[in-house]
Design a protein with these regions (language model features):
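Alpha-helical interface subdomain recognition
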Residues: 1-94, 98, 104, 116-121, ...
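Short Ser/Thr-interspersed hydrophobic loop/turn segments at strand-loop and sheet-helix junctions
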Residues: 64, 87-92, 186, 202-207, ...
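Short glycine/proline-enriched turns and hinge-like loops at secondary-structure junctions
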Residues: 79-80, 148-151, 175-180, 193-196, ...
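Short Gly/Pro-enriched turn/cap motifs at secondary-structure boundaries
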Residues: 129, 144-148, 172-175, 189-191, ...
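A short, Trp-centered hydrophobic/proline-enriched beta-strand micro-motif
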Residues: 132-141
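Flexible, small-/acidic-enriched active-site or ligand-binding loops
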Residues: 152, 205-236
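A short core secondary-structure module
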Residues: 163, 167-211
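Long, acidic (Asp/Glu-rich), low-complexity accessory segments flanking structured domains
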Residues: 231-250
Length: 403
């Protein structure tokens, strides 16, 4: 967003503390209203039944919350990564499972294609992703390639005339069971290791592609996850993204942006946990008075507030820095270190926030059907996905020592 910073007196105290401009606050508030009205009512059934609401993405697209970073000529909003992070923050408050699917579609697939695909590929695939007619996903992780996703990658692609033929499998793929378009990484020159990886646009309708199994998760239920199989999957040669054997640049740049975009999801969940805990503390009575009157509960609420605000500051700082990431950039240097630090801190701190939130709720927090339990079951993923906490520490330390 390029809106100039307004005078401080025209802004509320929350904006002053967060550093949001009026235009940015409007993006956050509008997304919050939409998510509360349209997405929150879906959250309980999504968790209970592992249900995917097929109407959700078309509705989100019609409302203008897909293709945030895409140009208007493709149907997008023409905004920046920071605005996209604000939308994710709002969605995370009200339906964190759908927010996870949204960011896999919006950032891992759509924005990745926007940054790396050719103009012809963008014209072919982005409009349907922006409208919500198609769901997007990214295929990187494999059964034997998690933290070592590049070095241990086994999925291959060989050239056969006007097609590439993919063989292998991908695991833990968000949106996998419902995706129409996927950005998939495969080794085109296996002897070159990580330097022999290429990126491809794969349609779920291509021969040889199938969903092997839908995976049932502890948390983020309703956000669909699957193992995908490529069995002589024929992909048109025109669907190679960028240059052959240069996919590692797409991977590393995308991972830094992915980490920058996990933190706003953590922030939204943390904000909701604090709000729900405040409401519970005010209404739950023991010993003839609200438990909010007890100093131990007040201590937990104070700790939660401090941690939420710390996540907010770090998240916004990182999003603003990631706004300037050039195409093909990242995977090294200050932004690589910062995005790893941001998501490590946000996920770890969110864990502390939710631990206090469940304790405030007491027995109710341990019951599956409560909202706070729904949040608590989900947050472990954020210490695993987009690089585990341990990998994040390796990145941070590596950049420190190189400096």
């Amino acid at each position: 967003m390029s809106a100039s910073q307004p005078a401080a007196e025209s802004r509320n105290s929350a904006q002053v503390f967060s550093g949001l401009s009026d235009a940015e606050q409007e993006v956050l508030d509008a997304a919050d209203r939409f998510a509360r009205q349209e997405l929150y009512p879906l959250s309980r059934r999504m968790d209970d039944e592992e249900w995917w609401p097929p109407q959700a993405f078309p509705l989100i697209g019609r409302t203008g919350y897909l293709g945030i970073t895409a140009p208007p000529e493709l149907g997008g909003a023409g905004m920046d990564l920071f605005a996209s992070g604000l939308v994710l923050q709002a969605f995370g408050r009200w339906n964190h499972a759908l927010a996870l699917s949204w960011v896999a579609h919006e950032n891992l697939c759509l924005n990745n294609l926007l940054r790396n695909a050719s103009a012809a590929q963008a014209r072919q695939y982005l409009p349907a992703l922006i409208s919500g007619a198609h769901v997007g996903a990214l295929g990187l992780t494999e059964p034997g390639a998690g933290s070592d996703a590049l070095g241990s990658m086994r999925t291959t692609a060989r050239r056969d005339g006007d097609h590439w033929v993919l063989n292998g499998s991908k695991l833990y793929i968000t949106n996998g069971p419902v995706a129409d378009v996927l950005l998939v990484y495969a080794k085109t020159s296996p002897d070159k290791g990580a330097q022999g990886i290429s990126a491809f646009i794969v349609e779920s309708a291509f021969p040889g592609f199938r969903v092997a199994q839908k995976l049932v998760k502890m948390g983020f239920r309703g956000s669909q996850t699957a193992e995908l199989v490529f069995d002589e999957c024929r992909v048109p040669a025109a669907n190679l993204v960028g240059e052959e054997d240069r996919g590692v640049r797409v991977v590393m740049s995308g991972l830094d942006l992915e980490r920058a975009m996990v933190a706003p999801l953590c922030l939204g969940i943390a904000e909701r946990a604090l709000a729900v805990s405040l409401e519970y503390a005010r209404t739950r009575k023991q010993f003839g008075q609200p438990i909010a009157n007890f100093q131990m509960i007040q201590s937990k609420l104070a700790d939660m507030y401090v941690r939420v605000e710390a996540i907010r500051v770090f998240t916004y700082q990182t999003l603003r820095a990631a706004n300037d990431l050039e195409i093909g950039g990242g995977g090294r240097g200050g932004i690589h270190q910062l995005t790893a630090a941001s998501v490590m801190f946000a996920a770890d701190t969110l864990n502390q926030v939710l631990d206090d939130a469940v304790q405030i709720h007491g027995g109710a927090g341990y019951i599956w059907e409560t909202e706070i339990n729904r949040l608590y079951r989900s947050i472990k993923l954020l210490e695993i996905g987009a690089g585990t906490t341990e990998v994040r520490k390796i990145i941070i330390a590596g950049e420190l020592l190189r400096g």
